[in-house]
């Protein structure tokens, strides 16, 4: 795992077309902004897990 340190307003790039910007830090919460092409899905991990579980449930029905 790559670990990076960023300050508010700073960004990191993934490939040529995805950027993640730190928008705000308050206590133990970090607000980030993600710029990605429309064909790239961006989800919080817990939402992604629910989507995958629903897909698995549909495929076994």
From Swiss-Prot:
The record ties this protein, via Gene3D superfamilies, to:
Translational regulator CsrA
Per UniProt, subcellular location reads as: Cytoplasm
InterPro entries per the UniProt record, alphabetical: CsrA (IPR003751), CsrA_sf (IPR036107)
Source domain of life: Bacteria
The Gene Ontology biological process annotation of the record reads: mRNA catabolic process; negative regulation of translational initiation; positive regulation of translational initiation; regulation of carbohydrate metabolic process
Is Acetylation tagged as a keyword?
no
Keywords annotated in UniProt: Activator, Cytoplasm, Repressor, RNA-binding, Translation regulation
- Cite the SUPFAM superfamilies for this sequence: CsrA-like
What GO MF annotations does this protein's record show? mRNA 5'-UTR binding
Which cellular component terms (GO) are annotated to the entry? Answer: cytosol
The record ties this protein, via Pfam families, to: CsrA (PF02599)
Q: What does this protein do?
A: A key translational regulator that binds mRNA to regulate translation initiation and/or mRNA stability. Mediates global changes in gene expression, shifting from rapid growth to stress survival by linking envelope stress, the stringent response and the catabolite repression systems. Usually binds in the 5'-UTR; binding at or near the Shine-Dalgarno sequence prevents ribosome-binding, repressing translation, binding elsewhere in the 5'-UTR can activate translation and/or stabilize the mRNA. Its function is antagonized by small RNA(s).
Homology family: Belongs to the CsrA/RsmA family.
User: Partners and quaternary state?
Assistant: Homodimer; the beta-strands of each monomer intercalate to form a hydrophobic core, while the alpha-helices form wings that extend away from the core.
Q: What is this protein called?
A: Translational regulator CsrA
- What gene name does this entry carry? csrA
């Amino acid at each position: 795992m790559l670990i990076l340190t960023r300050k508010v307003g700073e960004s990191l790039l993934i490939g040529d077309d995805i950027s993640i910007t730190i928008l705000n830090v308050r206590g133990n919460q970090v607000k980030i902004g993600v710029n990605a092409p429309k064909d790239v899905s961006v989800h919080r991990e817990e939402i992604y897990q629910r989507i995958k579980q629903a897909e698995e449930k549909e495929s076994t029905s």
